[in-house]
Amino acid sequence: MATEQTILVGKKPTTNYVIATVMAFNAGVKKVVLKARGAAISKAVSTAVMVRDRFLPGKVQIKDIKLLSDKVQGQGGRERTVAAIEVVLEMA
């Protein structure tokens, strides 16, 4: 049984990530890391808050939030810097 699972947040609806997070905790995972870049950052934050407040109230806490920047290859071969976030959720 894995003690940690990483969920990459992207273009899918927020509820997909909420369900994936809740299913991971129900399967026995102790820590879930939500990772997102760019426009998906707000979706990762919304996912963490929805899991903590609505789906598993009192059972999950936000343990850590890391703000990062990633270098990605943009159009025309130029390197761009994109904001990123990691939200760590743990069972209380």
UniProtKB/Swiss-Prot annotation:
- GO molecular function annotation: double-stranded DNA binding; RNA binding
What subcellular compartments does it reside in? Cytoplasm; Chromosome
Main location per UniProt?
Answer: cytoplasm
> Which keywords label this protein?
Acetylation, Chromosome, Cytoplasm, DNA condensation, DNA-binding
Q: Where are the transmembrane segments?
A: none
Q: Which GO terms describe its cellular component?
A: chromosome; cytoplasm
Describe how it is modified after translation.
Answer: Acetylated. Acetylation at Lys-11 decreases DNA-binding affinity.
Q: Which residues form a coiled coil?
A: none
- GO annotations under biological process? chromosome condensation
Keyword DNA-binding belongs to the record: yes
Locate the N6-acetyllysine modifications and list their residues.
11
HAMAP family in alphabetical order: AlbA
Q: What does this protein do?
A: Binds double-stranded DNA tightly but without sequence specificity. Involved in DNA compaction.
Q: Which family does it belong to?
A: Belongs to the histone-like Alba family.
- Under which name does UniProt file this protein? DNA/RNA-binding protein Alba
Organism whose genome encodes this protein: Pyrobaculum aerophilum (strain ATCC 51768 / DSM 7523 / JCM 9630 / CIP 104966 / NBRC 100827 / IM2)
Q: Which gene encodes it?
A: albA
